[in-house]
């Protein structure tokens, strides 16, 4: 994370069952003025944990898990994450979204994630596509939309 901060590059964090520890690490870096931008890949945390990462400037990325019927806390996160702080992903070849759950995940299945996010957020697929494209541009410093 020090190198990412030094090079002004974003970090991609896969944090599973260790949100408290990761928040502590990021808070320590932030207190030193050295916390890089980044994204919490394949989000599986709680709304409270999400808020803590958002407060540190991180983005939250939702995978096929958001389509799972029993993923209630992730659904709540997907509904409440700010428009300018989320991404979507597939995590291929793992965690295929409904209706492909249990199969090998494919990049094309990101559309299932986007549709599910649109339903959860009571918006259109077009809105999800635009918001996540803009957010990816902002985080990764490239130009998709022009």
Give residue spans per PLM region:
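Catalytic pocket-lining loop regions of alpha/beta-barrel enzymes
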Residues: 1-87
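Mid-to-C-terminal alpha-helical segments outside catalytic/metal-binding sites
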Residues: 3, 108-146
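Alpha-helix initiation/capping motif
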Residues: 15, 42, 67, 99-106, ...
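Residues that scaffold the ATP/ADP-binding catalytic core of kinase and kinase-like folds
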Residues: 25, 97-98, 139
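Active-site micro-motifs of SAM-dependent methyltransferase domains
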Residues: 60, 94, 138
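Short acidic/histidine-rich active-site segments
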Residues: 84-106, 128
């Amino acid at each position: 994370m020090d190198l990412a901060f030094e090079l002004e590059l974003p970090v991609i964090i896969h944090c599973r069952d260790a949100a408290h520890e990761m928040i502590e690490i990021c808070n320590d870096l932030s207190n030193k003025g050295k916390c890089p931008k980044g994204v919490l890949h394949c989000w599986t945390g709680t709304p409270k944990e999400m808020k803590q990462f958002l407060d540190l400037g991180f983005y939250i990325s939702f995978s096929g898990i958001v389509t799972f019927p029993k993923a209630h806390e992730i659904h709540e996160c997907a509904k409440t994450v700010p428009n300018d702080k989320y991404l979507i992903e597939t995590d291929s070849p793992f965690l295929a979204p409904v209706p492909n759950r249990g199969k090998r995940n494919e990049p094309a299945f990101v559309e299932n994630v986007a549709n599910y996010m649109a339903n959860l957020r009571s918006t259109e697929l077009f809105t999800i596509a635009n918001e996540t494209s803009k957010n990816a541009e902002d985080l990764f410093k490239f130009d998709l939309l022009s």
